[in-house]
Every structure is written in structure tokens, then in C-alpha cells.
Swiss-Prot record:
It is found in: Cytoplasm. Its EC number is 4.3.2.1. This is Argininosuccinate lyase. The keyword Lyase applies. Keywords: Amino-acid biosynthesis, Arginine biosynthesis, Cytoplasm, Lyase. It comes from Pyrobaculum islandicum (strain DSM 4184 / JCM 9189 / GEO3). Belongs to the lyase 1 family. Argininosuccinate lyase subfamily. Pathway: Amino-acid biosynthesis; L-arginine biosynthesis; L-arginine from L-ornithine and carbamoyl phosphate: step 3/3. The gene is argH.
């Protein structure tokens, strides 16, 4: 029988399995212990908990491991931890830990801290990804290729320019992630179930003890809101959505029908019946899991939106979707990094396609217009010549000498990639 509901009576194995979060709580086990340590320290600091009891509890908490606490007989890890302490120290000592706390504010704190830990791991992976993108961009700064719009060959660029586009996505994601991390660093501790606690807790001090930087002001919002989870999951899924577009490009370009990307052997599999096949399975799984992450974000939003402002067990069910998004993203970026490091790009084939499919037509038309011919007149004349097969287009080298900032000009690519690599060397990962 669960601990807290023992005065109500046995709920039965079916209901216990159905409502318990104990299996999912492995994600927050370390943070739950950390939050409890901060709580006990603070109660002792303000003279509410006897020092002897606090010392005994803190010493015992050092021995606590997730494996000891994740027992299926409990509703959740918070109940399991309190019962574990009481079993070891007795109610006269460990019975103090329930004062001034609710599972509502403590689980919100543990989720925030665990989310911070996972967000930090993801951030480090994305920072590493940016450094590899910059290194590859410098390597392929002069590697001409067609860009693609509407899945049709478009303006001539370089593969280095393409990689810097992915880098800019990563940079924008890290900017958003930093803002979300500030939300995560606000403590809900001391908020109680909804309206605070009569125990004279210094919420700012308790926040610092638990590893937070600030306090969520309103107690109801602190314990009952999951905006921080929605914001984090939304940012991560938006990043995965955009990155999956690059993954889709790489999968297509790996096809021998295109022949731009040579995938490392470790990332491909083969067919059970067609021995010639080299299927880029890692990126296929990435693409699928990016879509799955979007499903988890939708589920997270759907669960949260249907309950009033205050804790309900629905929020317990919502949290697993946050972990799924973060875990998929972290693992997916690791796969993407490994692929980037080991792949190669066929510059000869890509250049041939850029020339074959008129990828310098816009630059040719612009150059004619800049000599004094109205652009639309130059455009239609060039279109006619392309149709007739008589067009004399600019060379790839000439076309790429665009003077605008952020263009595919190889010198622009080299400058941007080199600047990025300096930062990578100054802050090695």
C-alpha cells in the first residue's frame, strides 16, 4: 500500500500501476534528493527542524540512490523518499521533512532542475555541432553546388555556404535556449500546494540552496504552471523540425541518383535481399524521431491546456513528453555530429549539376542589368536564350563573387567559418 493514502485504504494493484509515476520518476530522482537536501538544510537554518534531526536526515540522504527509491509500491518518488527516510530514522526524526513542503512545489522544482541538466547537455552538443559545421564549411568553402528551391536547381552556392546556414539555425536555437534556461532557473520551492506555507521559509535562500537563481513569485503559478516545460519543449522541437530539413537533404543527396553525399559506412545499413543497397538509416531514424518529438510536444500542450491553474495529476502525465523531446534531441544531435564528422561531399558532381542546370542565370541577368539594361528586359532575353539553348551564362567562379554580406561568396564563407573556429578554439568543448 502507498504511504500517504494508507489512511484511506488499499487501492489495488491495477489502480496503483495506472496512477503511479514511479517508472517515469527515474528522470528526476537525483533532483528530488537534491531538493530534499536543500529543504532540510533550510528548515534547520531557520530553527524549525531540530539540528540533530537535520544532521541525521542529511547524512542518510547521502546514501540514497535512485534504485532504492524507485519501488512500484509508491505513488511517486517523493512519497518513496519520505517513507525511505522514516524507515531508516523513525518518524520522530524523518517526520519533519513533510513540514513546509508539498509534492506540488517539490516536483516542479525537480522537473526544472532535471530539465536544466538535460538542456545543458543538449546545449553542449549543439555548440560542438556548430564547431564541426564551421570546420566543414571552411573545408568546402569553394565547393560549388546548386541550391534548391521547390526541389529544383536554383542559384549557385557552395556546400560551405549551405553548412553555415545550418550553423545559423543552431545559433538561433542556442539564443532561444538561453532565454528558456532563465525560466528554468526560477525556484517554485516554498510555494506549497498552491498558496504558500505557514512555515516561515525564506524562498530566496531556499532557492539558492537548491541551485536556482531566482524565485517564481506567485505560489499558485509556481506549483501549478508548466509554461517552462512548454517553452523548452517548443524551442527544442522547433530546432529539430528545422534540422530535419537538412537531414532530409542529406538523405536525398546520398542517393546515387544525386551522388553529392558519401555517407560513412557506420551510418548505413543494407537490404536483406538487395545486396547493393546502402540505406542511410541513422538519418532516417533522426527524421522520424524529429516528427515523433512534434507529437510529444502536441501531447504536452494538449494535457496542460485542459486543466485549471493548479496541480492535477494530469501534469504528471505531461512530464514524460518533455523528457522524450529532450532525450530524442540530445541523442539525435549526437548522431548528426558523428555523421558530419565522417561524411564527404562530391564537389565535382555538385559543380557539374550547377553548370548543367543554369544555376548562374540570376547572376547573369543581374550583371546585364547592372550594365544599364532594365532587369526585366534582361531577364526575358536570357530566358529566351536558355529555352533555345543559346544562352552564354556566367561561370560559377564569376557568379559566386557576390559582394553582399552573408552571400555564398567563398571569401564570405571562409571569413564566417574562420571567425567561428576561433571561438571554438578559445572555448574547447
Amino acid at each position: 500500500m502507498s504511504f500517504y493514502r494508507s489512511w484511506i485504504g488499499e487501492e489495488g494493484e491495477l489502480i496503483k500501476r495506472y496512477t503511479s509515476s514511479i517508472k517515469d520518476d527515474v528522470e528526476i530522482a537525483e533532483e528530488v534528493i537534491k531538493v530534499m537536501e536543500a529543504h532540510v538544510k533550510h528548515l534547520a537554518e531557520v530553527g524549525i527542524m531540530p539540528k540533530e534531526a537535520a544532521d541525521a536526515i542529511l547524512k542518510t540522504l547521502k546514501e540514497a540512490t535512485p534504485e532504492q527509491l524507485l519501488s512500484s509500491e509508491f505513488e511517486d518518488i517523493h512519497e518513496a523518499l519520505e517513507k525511505w527516510l522514516i524507515d531508516r530514522l523513525g518518524e520522530e526524526t524523518a517526520g519533519w521533512v513533510g513540514l513546509g513542503r508539498s509534492r506540488n512545489d517539490h516536483v516542479a522544482a525537480a522537473i526544472r532542475l532535471a530539465a536544466l541538466r538535460k538542456a545543458s547537455a543538449l546545449r553542449k552538443n549543439v555548440e560542438k555541432m556548430r564547431c564541426i559545421l564551421a570546420k566543414k564549411a571552411l573545408e568546402y568553402a569553394d565547393c560549388a553546388m546548386p541550391s534548391f528551391t521547390h526541389f529544383q536547381p536554383a542559384q549557385a552556392i557552395t556546400f560551405g555556404h549551405y553548412l553555415l546556414a545550418v550553423d545559423e539555425l543552431a545559433a538561433e536555437f542556442l539564443h532561444v535556449l538561453k532565454a528558456v534556461e532563465k525560466l528554468l532557473k526560477r525556484s517554485p520551492l516554498g510555494a506549497g500546494p498552491a498558496g504558500g506555507t505557514r512555515t516561515p521559509i525564506d524562498r530566496e535562500r531556499l532557492a539558492k540552496l537548491a541551485g536556482f537563481e531566482d524565485v517564481v513569485e506567485n505560489a499558485l503559478y509556481a506549483s501549478g504552471s508548466r509554461f517552462f516545460a512548454l517553452a523548452l519543449a517548443s524551442a527544442v522541437v522547433s530546432f529539430l523540425t528545422e534540422l530535419s530539413r537538412t537531414v532530409d537533404d542529406l538523405i536525398r543527396w546520398n542517393s546515387p541518383l544525386v551522388g553529392y553525399v558519401a555517407a560513412p559506412d557506420s551510418h548505413v545499413s543494407t537490404s536483406s535481399i538487395m545486396p547493393h543497397k546502402r540505406n542511410l538509416v541513422t538519418l532516417e531514424v533522426f527524421r522520424a524521431r524529429a516528427a515523433e518529438a512534434l507529437g510529444h510536444l502536441t501531447a504536452l500542450n494538449a494535457v496542460v491546456m485542459k486543466i485549471g491553474l493548479g496541480y492535477s495529476l494530469d501534469l504528471q502525465e505531461a512530464t514524460r513528453h518533455l523528457w522524450a523531446v529532450l532525450n530524442m534531441a540530445t541523442e539525435g544531435v549526437e548522431i548528426f555530429i558523428d555523421f558530419l564528422e565522417k561524411m564527404s561531399f562530391n564537389c565535382v558532381k555538385a559543380r557539374e549539376d550547377a553548370e548543367r542546370y543554369h544555376s548562374t542565370s540570376s547572376d547573369t541577368a543581374e550583371t546585364i542589368a547592372l550594365s544599364g539594361v532594365p532587369f526585366r528586359k534582361a531577364y526575358f532575353q536570357l530566358a529566351k536564350e536558355i529555352k533555345e539553348g543559346t544562352a552564354r551564362l556566367m561561370s560559377i567562379e564569376e557568379a559566386l563573387q557576390r559582394p553582399t554580406r552573408g552571400s555564398a561568396n567563398p571569401e564570405e564563407v571562409k571569413k564566417a567559418a574562420s571567425t567561428r573556429l576561433v571561438f571554438c578554439r578559445e572555448k574547447p568543448l
